[in-house]
């Protein structure tokens, strides 16, 4: 074999080696180029899926928390309404009970007032009658004080015009000095409990 042939073979071998080496480099670099063009790694795909799963779960938990909050507010409002209703019912029951007591007590007060209206004047009282009359006056004073503490007020009558919301006319008389329907006398005192009439005043009015 001549030197020329050997040189050509050697050159050809080197050329083949270069081609093979170039092929190995291209084979190794192609996946890297493709990876950089948007392919995701398995680890990245797993992380993104987990994040999406957690976000979905967080949204569900927020929605559930909102429902619990709305339910809690509704129950709190229901309880507050129930409490206020019971307070109103208790106040109304207490007011009705007080009103019933006052209604039963008013005839006693009427009798005490009539007794004192017909009692002798202080200067005319005998030594025997004076202690009893003074005792009745003390009872009347205490009863009126108790009524005042409970918010009970007597209805103004004499000298005012008849008002059917507060007065009940039981008689009419001629009275030159009074206008028609003006109250000139009171037969029975009327009372208010707060702003509610618990007994109308029975009055006599001018024609």
Curated annotation (Swiss-Prot):
Listed under GO biological process in this entry are: protein folding
Q: Which UniProt keywords apply?
A: Chaperone, Cytoplasm, Stress response
Q: What is its main location?
A: cytoplasm
Pfam families linked to this entry:
GrpE (PF01025)
Please state where this protein is localized: Cytoplasm
List GO terms (cellular component aspect).
Answer: cytoplasm
Which Gene3D superfamilies does this UniProt record tie to the protein?
3.90.20.20, Head domain of nucleotide exchange factor GrpE
Which segments does the entry list as coiled coil? none
What Gene Ontology molecular function terms does this protein carry? Answer: adenyl-nucleotide exchange factor activity; protein homodimerization activity; protein-folding chaperone binding; unfolded protein binding
Keyword presence, Cytoplasm: yes
Record's InterPro entries?
GrpE (IPR000740), GrpE_coiled_coil (IPR013805), GrpE_head (IPR009012)
UniProt cross-references to PANTHER family, sorted A to Z = GRPE PROTEIN, GRPE PROTEIN HOMOLOG, MITOCHONDRIAL
- What is this protein's function per UniProt? Participates actively in the response to hyperosmotic and heat shock by preventing the aggregation of stress-denatured proteins, in association with DnaK and GrpE. It is the nucleotide exchange factor for DnaK and may function as a thermosensor. Unfolded proteins bind initially to DnaJ; upon interaction with the DnaJ-bound protein, DnaK hydrolyzes its bound ATP, resulting in the formation of a stable complex. GrpE releases ADP from DnaK; ATP binding to DnaK triggers the release of the substrate protein, thus completing the reaction cycle.
Under the heading HAMAP family, the entry gives:
GrpE
Q: What do we know about how this protein assembles, alone or with others?
A: Homodimer.
* Family membership: Belongs to the GrpE family.
Q: What is this protein called?
A: Protein GrpE
**Organism, as annotated:** Pelodictyon phaeoclathratiforme (strain DSM 5477 / BU-1)
| Protein encoded by which gene | grpE
């Amino acid at each position: 074999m001549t030197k020329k042939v050997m040189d050509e073979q050697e050159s050809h071998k080197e050329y083949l080696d270069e081609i093979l080496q170039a092929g190995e480099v291209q084979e190794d670099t192609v996946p890297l180029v493709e990876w950089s063009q948007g392919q995701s790694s398995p680890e990245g795909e797993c992380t993104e899926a987990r994040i999406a799963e957690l976000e979905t779960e967080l949204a569900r938990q927020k929605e559930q928390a909102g429902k619990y909050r709305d339910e809690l507010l509704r129950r709190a409002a229901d309880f507050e309404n129930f409490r206020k209703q019971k307070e109103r019912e208790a106040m109304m029951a207490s007011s009705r009970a007080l009103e019933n007591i006052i209604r039963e007590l008013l005839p006693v007060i009427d009798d005490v007032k009539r007794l004192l209206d017909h009692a002798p004047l202080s200067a005319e009282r005998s030594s025997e009658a004076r202690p009893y009359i003074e005792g009745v006056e003390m009872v009347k004073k205490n009863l009126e004080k108790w009524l005042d503490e409970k918010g009970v007020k007597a209805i103004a009558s004499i000298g005012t015009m008849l008002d059917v919301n507060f007065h009940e006319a039981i008689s009419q008389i001629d009275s030159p000095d009074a206008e028609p329907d003006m109250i000139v006398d009171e037969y029975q005192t009327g009372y208010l409990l707060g702003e509610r009439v618990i007994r109308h005043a029975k009055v006599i009015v001018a024609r």
